[in-house]
Design a protein with these regions (language model features):
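Short alpha-helical "patches" and their helix-cap loops
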Residues: 24-42, 109-126
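Long, positively charged, glycine-interspersed low-complexity recognition regions
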Residues: 100-141
Length: 141
């Protein structure tokens, strides 16, 4: 049962969370790359997105609303318990948090509103383990 549930979380995290975030921050990631890597990144990511990095960035203020709505299962869970995994964080939390930490490391774009339970959850995980994630280089989002 646990592995099957883990696979579902992986797929949901990859298809909803990660692929929801990526178009909104792709242009910011490009800016962090070495010049020698930027052409390859642009070519392959624009092919994946079906638009230029600039077009993806231009629509992110609208796209973020759809992304936030897609987080409803997380939000509903976090309204009834402190972590996705229950009373304490577990794999479910870490697999989802990884995408938010990656976004924080590469983009100043605000994915979450401060009054969102998902924002509060992310804040707790940023402070977990002595604040290890928060101390890592990143933007204040």
């Amino acid at each position: 049962g646990g592995r099957a549930m883990g696979r579902m979380l992986n797929w949901w995290g990859d298809t909803v969370v990660l692929m929801g975030v990526f178009p909104m921050i792709a242009s910011d990631i490009h800016g962090h790359l070495r010049p020698v890597d930027q052409a390859y990144f642009r070519k392959t990511r624009e092919a994946r997105l079906g638009k230029t990095l600039e077009e993806a960035a231009a629509s992110r203020d609208t796209a973020v609303e759809g992304f936030r709505n897609a987080l409803t299962p997380m939000r509903l869970t976090l309204k009834t318990q402190p972590y996705l995994g229950g009373a304490s964080p577990n794999y479910a939390d870490y697999i989802m948090f990884g995408t938010f930490q990656w976004a924080r490391a590469t983009s100043p774009f605000r994915l979450l509103k401060e009054d969102d339970p998902v924002y509060a959850w992310r804040e707790k995980l940023l402070d977990a383990f002595g604040g290890m994630a928060r101390k890592s280089p990143g933007y204040a989002v």
